[in-house]
Amino acid sequence: MSAANPETPNSTISREANTQSSSAATSQGYVLPEGKIMPNTVFVGGIDVRMDETEIRGFFARYGSVKEVKIITDRTGVSKGYGFVSFFNDVDVQKIVESQINFHGKKLKLGPAIRKQNLCAYHVQPRPLVFNHPPPPQFQNVWSNPNTETYMHPPTTMNPVTQYVQAYPPYPNSPVQVITGYQLPVYNYQMPPQWPVGEQRSYVVPPAYSSVNYYCNEIDPGAEVVPNECSVCEATPPSGNGPQKKSVDRSIQTVVSCLFNPENSRLRNSVVTQDDYFRDKRVHHFRRSRAVLKSV
């Protein structure tokens, strides 16, 4: 009779595993995670820090021969409050789970041991940690259309000459503060000289010409050139009866001043430069002004 219904240990373990798997979802009202149920192993939760493995082994020895007691601890060696008890022989794990066990005045939380990702766990399901990295900072060109796409703004190159830096306060929706450099244009003004009232001075400022040589056939190339001082007459107010002011302009001591002097009419075939030519015209202007004042 017994040979007709042989029962092997493997068939017993599979039947027990199927029984535990069917009742795992309702063990003491807790929702168990999915995974492989370890046979002959009980999850024990609610372990007090004062309990050690020896006491737990002695307590569960009444249900069968205890193979191993494992209390889960952290890196510092402190108990996390749960562990596992495994047996050598086949035990009724469901009967142990359904029993109300109080140890040292504290109720233990029992359940089937479930292995997931090579770790034994009861009610803790590992979840991957997701880190939300902040987006890279983006800068928007304040001079372009706001509807255009954003891009990385290059560093502003500042001119070292005459800079004015104006910092705009950041707007509520603006990610960064933009500093814009302005360069003030430099203007060069040439103001005419201011003379006192009553004095009239007329000077001819020559434009920038290229170097031009003027030749005079009335100059003797072998004659000696002697600088001469030309007197400059300054006009006086027509209403005044005071004497005329005379001053000597020593800046006009050129070779050209001797060309139009009657005493030096013997000079011939001398070369006259551009600067001498315009200074000569200035001497003629002074002399003509003096002649007009004398006639008045």
Swiss-Prot record:
Limits of the RRM domain: 40-115
Expression tissues: Testis specific.
Keywords: Cytoplasm, Developmental protein, Differentiation, Nucleus, Phosphoprotein, RNA-binding, Spermatogenesis, Translation regulation
This protein's record includes keyword Hydrolase: no
Region annotated Homodimerization, chain positions: 80-132
Pfam families listed in its UniProt record: Daz, RRM_1
GO cellular component: cytoplasm; nucleus
SMART domains per UniProt: RRM
Region (Disordered): 1-25
Listed InterPro entries: DAZ_dom (IPR043628), DAZ_RRM_vert (IPR037551), Nucleotide-bd_a/b_plait_sf (IPR012677), RBD_domain_sf (IPR035979), RRM_dom (IPR000504)
Comment field on protein domains: The DAZ domain mediates the interaction with DAZAP1 and DAZAP2.
Chain's role: RNA-binding protein, which is essential for gametogenesis in both males and females. Plays a central role during spermatogenesis. Acts by binding to the 3'-UTR of mRNA, specifically recognizing GUU triplets, and thereby regulating the translation of key transcripts.
Name recorded for this polypeptide: Deleted in azoospermia-like
Upper taxonomic lineage: Eukaryota, Metazoa, Chordata, Craniata, Vertebrata
